[in-house]
Regions:
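Transmembrane alpha-helix termini and helix-breaking/packing motifs in multi-pass membrane transporters
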Residues: 54-59, 170-183
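Cytoplasmic helix-loop-helix junction between adjacent transmembrane helices
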Residues: 125-166
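Helix-loop boundary and gating motifs at the non-cytosolic
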Residues: 21-75
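Residue-level signature of mid-helix packing/kink "hotspots" within the transmembrane helices
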Residues: 75-83, 168-169
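Helix-loop junctions at membrane interfaces in 12-TM secondary transporters
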Residues: 112-125
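Small-residue-rich transmembrane alpha-helices and their cytosolic helix-loop interfaces
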Residues: 38, 71, 75, 103, ...
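Helix-to-loop junctions at the C-terminal end of transmembrane segments
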Residues: 81-93, 179
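Structural signature of the two symmetry-related core transmembrane helices
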Residues: 97-111
Length: 183
């Protein structure tokens, strides 16, 4: 029987949990902060945006065409601005202002949904939120990559994605609990 070469920090039973936890704990504060911000941001986003179709149809009395316009404009905006912000950050090496503006647009814009009285108003708020995403995504990734050495980039990005995905799970759970409590 052939001998299996083990990866560093991987035990014979495949348990590398303690080594992985140690590696995660050693990540720089910047990576932890970006991860936490992403968790909170994604939680708030996933609390609201899955309810937009229902809000459009039952409160704003808009149809599927309005939803298509809103989401099409929003996602196209985010995609184009990611390219723009990436180019700007590569040239200037200043990522933090873009990240702050990007997350700030989301934080200030989302609560305004409560005051929207028409679907064009919702379009403006969703547009602003996606402008924020476009501004922050590439600079955030550049800051993450620059915060760790090449040997830790996979861990840093994996940790960030895990925190982001945790927010995507927490948000709908909180929204569901709030809806149940409010009925």
């Amino acid at each position: 029987m052939a001998e299996i070469a083990l990866q560093p920090n991987l035990t014979a039973d495949g348990n590398d949990g303690p080594a992985m936890l140690s590696t995660i704990r050693q990540l720089p504060r910047t990576v932890w902060l970006i991860g936490f911000i992403s968790l909170v941001n994604d939680s708030s986003s996933e609390m609201l945006y899955p309810l937009i179709p229902l809000y459009l149809s039952s409160v704003l009395m808009a149809g599927p065409r309005a939803l298509g316009i809103i989401e099409g404009v929003a996602e196209a905006t985010a995609s184009l601005l990611k390219l723009f912000s990436g180019v700007v950050v590569d040239r200037t090496r200043h990522s933090k202002p873009w990240i702050v503006i990007g997350y700030g647009l989301a934080a200030f814009g989302r609560p305004l949904i409560a005051f929207v009285t028409s679907w064009p108003g919702l379009l403006v708020i969703r547009f602003a939120d996606r402008v924020g995403k476009g501004f922050r995504s590439s600079p955030r990734d550049a800051l993450l990559a620059g915060s760790v050495g090449p040997d830790q980039r996979g861990v840093a990005f994996g940790f960030h994605r895990a925190m982001d995905n945790a927010g995507a799970v927490i948000g709908p759970l909180v929204a569901s609990a709030l809806l149940v409590a409010g009925t």
